[in-house]
Structures are given as structure tokens and as C-alpha cells.
């Protein structure tokens, strides 16, 4: 462990200071410390120093410098999650500034597809919703066995997958909601199919036949004989004659009603007189 020339700290001590300042959130102080480091290639290629520079570049909004650091050096796998977050968040911020609005889930997905993680901070394994496929496989296998893991089982799954307990809980909750929605949709489709089949099986009236029921009053009235029709027609005509101003031949509209009755009696006498005489002659 050799001291750096004209600095007074070893390389290991510099790395330790960088880690402590990062964990404490003292990013401005970390930036000043990095600026004070001597121009030593061996020191500036230290992974802890490079990671500290990336954190400070993101904090100051210097995304171009951040991308340059992340793409130019191969980092250890244990540093990948932190550096991947910096890469994605920086691209999200730039996209939001261009669009003038926050990104939704679809917008973030498009950004990830447009700016994939560099292989310097990614092991090449496909991720889904920020979960590695290996982790999702473990969760799917457990879900098939038990969709409702206990708190202790969730902690064990978190340790096995490298996720947090909250992430594990949310994954199971979302998976149960998707399955319930799929089951409800399937039941709805089955009920609709059964309803359609029942309607097709119902009997329908024969084509061209008389309807079983009719709202017309004529359908509920018995058929009338020709004699009845004649009587009704005659009665209707007589009623119409009484109610109207129609005048019989030889009478004027100004004649009183008793004149009409007298004329009717005269007609009856003229018609019945000869008939009566004929009957008397036949009887004698």
C-alpha cells in the first residue's frame, strides 16, 4: 500500500472515502474530493472512483459525461444495478425534457428499447419490468405452487431472487389480479356462448302462418253472418238518415217532422192497400 505522490492518501483510502461520501449522500463534497485528486491514471481508473464520478455527473445533470464513463469502462457485476439506474434515469430525464411531460410506463419502455444498457454495466441477460428472467422464473414456479406466500416465504424469495420483499409482494399481487381478470373474461365469454345457443334452440312461429296472438279486436270477435251484416248496415243507414238533413222525395228540408211522419203513413197505405184487397179477394 503506497502513498500517492503529493497527496497523502493511498488508492484504497481514496476508494473508501468515495464509498462513504456516496452512502452519506454528500455528493457536492464528493465532487470537490474528486476534483482534488492528483492526475494519476492508475487512481482514476479505480472502479470506486469511476462509480463516484458517474454519480456526481448524474447529480449535476452532466449526462454526456455520465454516458462516457459508463460506456468506456468495464464494471464489476455487483455495481451493475446502481449504474443501470443512473443510465436509465438519465435517459428518462432527457426524454421528459424533450416531450415536456412526465413519462408513463409505455414511454419508459420505448426509452429503454431506444437506449439499451451498454454491456459494460449489463451481463446480457434479458430483463422484464426490471426483473431478470431468472428471478421471474423462480417467482412463477412458486406461484404455481402457492399464489399466497407468507411473509417469511416472501423474505426467502427475496433473498433467492435478489429482489426486495416489496418487489416480491407486488409481483404476486399483480399476478393474482391478472389471473382473476382473465378468469372473469373467460366466464363472460362462456355465458354469452350459452345464451346464444339457447336462443337458437327456442321454437319460432312457422313462416306464412297466422300469428298466435293479435292485438286487433276483430280477432277476438265471432264471425258475423250475412244477415247480421245486412241488419247492421240497414240500421246504420236509418240512423244516418235520422241524424242528417236528408229529405225524402217530395219533401223539402224546411218541412216539420210531423209532415215526414204523415208522408210515411201515406206511403204505407199506398203499398198495403192493394195488398190487403188482394188478400180479401182470395179469401172470398
Swiss-Prot record:
Changing residue 110 to W: In BOS3; crucial for interaction with EYA1, DNA binding and transcription factor activity. Keywords: Activator, Apoptosis, Cytoplasm, Deafness, Developmental protein, Disease variant, DNA-binding, Homeobox, Non-syndromic deafness, Nucleus, Phosphoprotein, Repressor, Transcription, Transcription regulation, Ubl conjugation. Phosphorylated during interphase; becomes hyperphosphorylated during mitosis. Hyperphosphorylation impairs binding to promoter elements. Residues 179-190 have a biased composition (Basic and acidic residues). Changing residue 249 to L: In BOR; uncertain significance. Residues 168-269 are annotated as: Disordered. Disulfide bonds: none annotated. Changing residue 129 to C: In BOS3; crucial for interaction with EYA1, DNA binding and transcription factor activity. InterPro entries: HD, Homeobox_CS, Homeodomain-like_sf, KN_HD, SIX1_SD. GO terms for biological process: aorta morphogenesis; apoptotic process; branching involved in ureteric bud morphogenesis; cellular response to 3,3',5-triiodo-L-thyronine; cochlea morphogenesis; embryonic cranial skeleton morphogenesis; embryonic skeletal system morphogenesis; endothelin receptor signaling pathway. Specifically expressed in skeletal muscle. One of its GO terms (cellular component) is cytoplasm. Pfam families: Homeobox_KN, SIX1_SD. Residues 124-183 bind DNA. It is found in: Nucleus; Cytoplasm. GO terms for molecular function: chromatin binding; DNA binding; DNA-binding transcription activator activity, RNA polymerase II-specific; DNA-binding transcription factor activity; DNA-binding transcription factor activity, RNA polymerase II-specific; RNA polymerase II cis-regulatory region sequence-specific DNA binding; sequence-specific DNA binding; sequence-specific double-stranded DNA binding. It comes from the Eukaryota. Residues 242-269 have a biased composition (Polar residues). Belongs to the SIX/Sine oculis homeobox family. PANTHER family: HOMEOBOX PROTEIN SIX (PTHR10390), HOMEOBOX PROTEIN SIX1 (PTHR10390:SF13). Transcription factor that is involved in the regulation of cell proliferation, apoptosis and embryonic development. Plays an important role in the development of several organs, including kidney, muscle and inner ear. Depending on context, functions as a transcriptional repressor or activator. Lacks an activation domain, and requires interaction with EYA family members for transcription activation. Mediates nuclear translocation of EYA1 and EYA2. Binds the 5'-TCA[AG][AG]TTNC-3' motif present in the MEF3 element in the MYOG promoter and CIDEA enhancer. Interacts with DACH1. Interacts with EYA1. Interacts with EYA2. Interacts with CDH1. Interacts with TBX18. Interacts with CEBPA. Interacts with CEBPB. Interacts with EBF2. It is linked to Deafness, autosomal dominant, 23: A form of non-syndromic deafness characterized by prelingual, bilateral, symmetric hearing loss with a conductive component present in some but not all patients. This is Homeobox protein SIX1. It comes from Homo sapiens.
Amino acid at each position: 500500500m503506497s502513498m500517492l505522490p503529493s497527496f497523502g492518501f493511498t488508492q484504497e483510502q481514496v476508494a473508501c472515502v468515495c464509498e462513504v461520501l456516496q452512502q452519506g449522500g454528500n455528493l457536492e463534497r464528493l465532487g470537490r474530493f474528486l476534483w482534488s485528486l492528483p492526475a494519476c491514471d492508475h487512481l482514476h481508473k479505480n472502479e470506486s472512483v469511476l462509480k463516484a464520478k458517474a454519480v456526481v455527473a448524474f447529480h449535476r445533470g452532466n449526462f454526456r459525461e455520465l454516458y462516457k464513463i459508463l460506456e468506456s469502462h468495464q464494471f464489476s457485476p455487483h455495481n451493475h444495478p446502481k449504474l443501470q439506474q443512473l443510465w436509465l434515469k438519465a435517459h428518462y430525464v432527457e426524454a421528459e425534457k424533450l416531450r415536456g411531460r412526465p413519462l408513463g410506463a409505455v414511454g419508459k419502455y420505448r426509452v429503454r428499447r431506444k437506449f439499451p444498457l451498454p454491456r459494460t454495466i449489463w451481463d446480457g441477460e434479458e430483463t422484464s419490468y426490471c426483473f431478470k428472467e431468472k428471478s421471474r422464473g423462480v417467482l412463477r414456479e412458486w406461484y404455481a405452487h402457492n399464489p399466497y406466500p407468507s411473509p417469511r416465504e416472501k423474505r426467502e424469495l427475496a433473498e433467492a431472487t435478489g429482489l426486495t420483499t416489496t418487489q416480491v409482494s407486488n409481483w404476486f399481487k399483480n399476478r393474482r389480479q391478472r389471473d382473476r381478470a382473465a378468469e372473469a373474461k373467460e366466464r363472460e365469454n362462456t355465458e354469452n356462448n350459452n345464451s346464444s345457443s339457447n336462443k337458437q334452440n327456442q321454437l319460432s312461429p312457422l313462416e306464412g302462418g297466422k300469428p298466435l296472438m293479435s292485438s286487433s279486436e276483430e280477432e277476438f270477435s265471432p264471425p258475423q253472418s250475412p244477415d247480421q251484416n245486412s241488419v247492421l248496415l240497414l240500421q246504420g243507414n236509418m240512423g244516418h238518415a235520422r241524424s242528417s238533413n236528408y229529405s225524402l222525395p217530395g219533401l223539402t228540408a224546411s218541412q216539420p217532422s210531423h209532415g215526414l211522419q204523415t208522408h210515411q203513413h201515406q206511403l204505407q197505405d199506398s203499398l198495403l192497400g192493394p195488398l190487403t184487397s188482394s188478400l180479401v179477394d182470395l179469401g172470398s
